[in-house]
């Protein structure tokens, strides 16, 4: 079972379809780059499996959502956790959907609500994914109601805000992703779409307290771009210049977006992390030990980042990046 992050204020009524393009990429030493903070990086791996950890979300108290175990081979299931500060092996708290074989904790808010997805098998490939939300220690299934699911089922919640509004996606029988939101208080589902083209494949990956949603979608040209859909209905395309794909995976209340972009293809492809703000555009940012293998998944309102990278030995390591000064 693997994170589908390849692949809003949810549109209860008609959403304006203003499409804007994001700014250029800032590189080290440029004038734009000078406006960004310097980060201190820390690798954080659960001792239950030092070979595979992914950190996927962080709240303003510094609590981190993640999991260990690749899920890519029988006997190595995904196992979810939250990691509490100050970070150490004794600060990992297991969190797994009741009765599940595999669980990923993909997002959390400042109220302690967590979201993710689970599976009832660990076959290495072809495991079904089912969405869940945990409010006050009570787990609840949250699969989007549809009669057109892929086989096996793919349904994942990936982020949640302080209004307990979660976002994610499900995959249809043709392999297309459909973004949606789930209100953990009312149980209401709503579709999340690109207002300019509701038919495109799209995943909603994160949501802030204003209802601004970050995600990824397939463009009319067939490429994967990130997006920020504001609560006012403005759809901002996020595409790193020169990248073969861009995915927005996290957003905070200042509309700082984080994610990953790919340069090249096939065996030569490299993944780089990025941050983006409306004021300064893109900045490329890799974990120092993971140049070309970095994914940034989450950001809190203090600008702390979490994600993962592949190190020189081939292990997947979680990391925390904290602005300095």
Predicted features by range, described:
Residues 2, 6-10, 14, 25, ...:
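Residue-level hotspots at or immediately adjacent to binding/recognition sites across diverse folds
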Residues 19-25:
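Hydrophobic alpha-helical membrane-insertion segments, chiefly the h-region
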